[in-house]
A protein has these predicted regions:
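Ligand-binding cleft/hinge of the Venus flytrap
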Residues: 79, 95-102, 144, 226-241
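Solvent-exposed, polar/charged alpha-helical surfaces in well-ordered, non-transmembrane soluble domains
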Residues: 61, 71-75, 118-122, 141, ...
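Bacterial Sec-dependent N-terminal signal peptides
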Residues: 1-22
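Bacterial Sec-exported substrate-binding components of ABC uptake systems
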Residues: 17-72, 179-209
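A short, gly/pro- and small-residue-rich
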Residues: 81-83, 142-154, 275-288
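Extracytoplasmic substrate-binding proteins
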Residues: 62, 127, 136-217, 241-242, ...
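A short, structured surface patch at a secondary-structure boundary
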Residues: 43-47, 56, 61-121, 127-132
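Flexible, glycine-rich surface segments
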Residues: 197-281
Length: 288
């Protein structure tokens, strides 16, 4: 009897130790704006300063997205069919999404100014993936009270390109595709680091700048932004690399022209489809 009791005690102890050995945190390598913790058989996701809790076996079946970047992660994981609504559909260049918009398997639920509460409710999504848009907050709070989960994603705040890539893990968690997400992330990371090693040896670095005018200001990516890191790692010399900002830096056109006129490349020049569209008085000066 004592032997049976001791055996049971050992088994219980081993089981308890096994539970304690489970990881309680999914460690990020580059991303700083989200974290995932395991708590009492649930996953606690903190992203963009907000928290969402889901069961360990959670899998999103129907979602609404308000940002184009979310569609890229979802598509990479093979979960594009879970999207039932998007915001500002004219911004989406994904051909699968455009096709689904035409046949109404994906609905237009609003724009940057507002989202349609009744339409979203009728679509019955499990999850809304969005960013912090003050125009949405009141309606999102109402939808949250209806039991719809809200996941805030702001990958654009990351300061390293692989930090943005690492959001595959966040999307992999909510779509129950973590193995695929890890595999994709590792593949991109391996290739990125290999190319970075090659470009670290270059002696001639072309000068580049980015951005366009919005109103009276030219918004230039800061020196601590993911774009600045991407330019540096790809072998370019970013002319605003010395600005200590992770977001955009508003500049007067004259400031951009003074420094940018000697650049070899203007990268990320907005939504212009041709040089002709850019040839107004100011932009033409940048290309002389």
């Amino acid at each position: 009897m004592k032997k049976i009791f001791l055996l049971q005690l050992v088994l219980i102890t081993l089981c308890s130790c096994k539970k304690l050995d489970k990881p309680t945190v999914f460690d990020n390598e580059y991303a700083t704006n989200f974290s995932i913790h395991s708590e009492d058989n649930r996953l606690s996701i903190t992203s963009a300063g907000t928290n969402m809790q889901i069961p360990l076996d959670y899998k999103c079946k129907k979602c609404i997205i308000t940002t184009t970047s979310a569609s890229a992660y979802i598509d990479a994981l093979g979960e594009i069919n879970t999207i039932v609504g998007v915001c500002s559909p004219h911004y989406f260049y994904n051909t699968k999404i455009q096709e689904k918009l035409k046949n109404h398997s994906i609905e237009d639920i609003g724009n940057d100014g507002t989202i349609n509460f009744e339409k979203i409710l009728a679509l019955k999504p499990d999850l809304i993936i969005t960013d912090h848009n003050p125009n949405y907050e009141k309606i999102l709070n109402q939808l949250s009270r209806q039991g719809i989960k809200i996941l805030y994603v702001e990958e654009f705040m990351e300061i390293h390109p692989l930090g943005k890539t690492e959001y595959l893990k966040l999307f992999g968690t909510v779509f129950n595709q973590i193995k695929k997400a890890d595999s994709l992330y590792s593949f991109v990371k391996k290739n990125y680091e290999a190319l970075k090693e090659k470009t670290s040896q270059v002696t001639i670095r072309p000068k580049v700048f980015t951005g366009i005018m919005y109103g009276d200001s030219w918004y230039m990516a800061g020196g601590k932004s993911f774009l600045s890191t991407l330019f540096r790692d790809s072998g370019a010399q970013y002319l605003w690399d010395d600005t200590n900002k992770s977001g955009s830096v508003p500049l007067r056109f004259e400031e951009v022209l003074s420094k940018g006129k000697n650049a070899e490349y203007w990268i990320g020049a907005g939504n212009f489809k041709s040089k002709k569209e850019m040839l107004n008085l100011k932009y033409e000066l940048c290309m002389d």
